[in-house]
């Protein structure tokens, strides 16, 4: 029988075709422990899946890696779905993964994600729906197991923070098929009490199966529709349940839930003292500013009082009168000097002074002064005025 000699590439391609045509290998479901886990910059995920007897290299392409509901870690036991194929270039076979789920949680995890997506689409996780937790509650309702560590932690934290806050405990199952119903009844009971300010829904840590009651759909609606604000503290910090998403506030632990629901009286007192001091300082500053403004207004009023205005008015009148008197006196003095000067001029040019110098004034019979001889004719009569009297004369000869 003749057997063809194959090249390495031909052999690898042949093996790839054989593997790819195998139904089981094309629809593989494998469980094992993750090792050498790595996120590549391309977005692809590379890791190995191993057990006590062997190991297989795995790859998950970016399109599937983006759909992961959790972050895989080395040492984590998982279930993987995918297909086995051969990488021709290296001649190595590997598992091409399409899904990765934590081992033992596959169905529960899928149910959790399905319900979470449903409630998310209904808007039940909206921040707009979440209410503020009362800052100064008088009564807090606690729903949890009466025998677990959670109730002890809640009581211890609440007592330490504020002894004046009362609590009513509603003991219920916190795991098992009957737990959701009891939790819902406890919620209804506390919602019907008018004295309840806040509700704490809590339990200690556990496996996903033990915490599953808090992933119940009916319980989620009951928490969402609660008339009282609900604080959840289920499991440990890394545990998330459906009620955590629909509650008004999620706490990582039952103790943390008590810290959220119960105010620290010492911190509140210190805050009150600080606020009082700040208020006192603010009031004192306000009063001092008003006193300063009042003093300024008082000074302005004193400066502009009617009495001061009248006194200032009288002073202004006196000053004005003084200035006016001075100006009038000065004006009179100037006018007197003018009169004296004009009088001197008049006296110097007075006809009487001219007559005193030996001159005389000749006028005709009607009193007109005659200054030229051509105004006379023979035998006109004239009057001659001397300094000490008058004489009448007749013109006999004109020369």
Curated annotation (Swiss-Prot):
Q: What are the entry keywords? A: Cytoplasm, Exonuclease, Hydrolase, Nuclease
Alphabetically, the GO molecular function entries are:
exodeoxyribonuclease VII activity; nucleic acid binding
Q: What class of enzyme is it?
A: hydrolase
Q: Where in the cell is it found?
A: Cytoplasm
Specify whether RNA-binding is a keyword of the entry.
no
Enzyme Commission number(s) of this protein: 3.1.11.6
Q: Which GO terms describe its biological process?
A: DNA catabolic process
User: Which cysteine-cysteine pairs are annotated as disulfide bonds in the entry?
Assistant: none
Q: Which reaction does it catalyse?
A: Exonucleolytic cleavage in either 5'- to 3'- or 3'- to 5'-direction to yield nucleoside 5'-phosphates
What is the predominant subcellular site recorded for this chain?
A: cytoplasm
**This protein's GO CC annotations:** cytoplasm; exodeoxyribonuclease VII complex
Domain of life, per UniProt, equals Bacteria
* Oligomeric form and interacting partners: Heterooligomer composed of large and small subunits.
**Which family is this sequence assigned to?**
Belongs to the XseA family.
Q: Tell me, what does this protein do in biology?
A: Bidirectionally degrades single-stranded DNA into large acid-insoluble oligonucleotides, which are then degraded further into small acid-soluble oligonucleotides.
- UniProt-recorded name of the protein: Exodeoxyribonuclease 7 large subunit
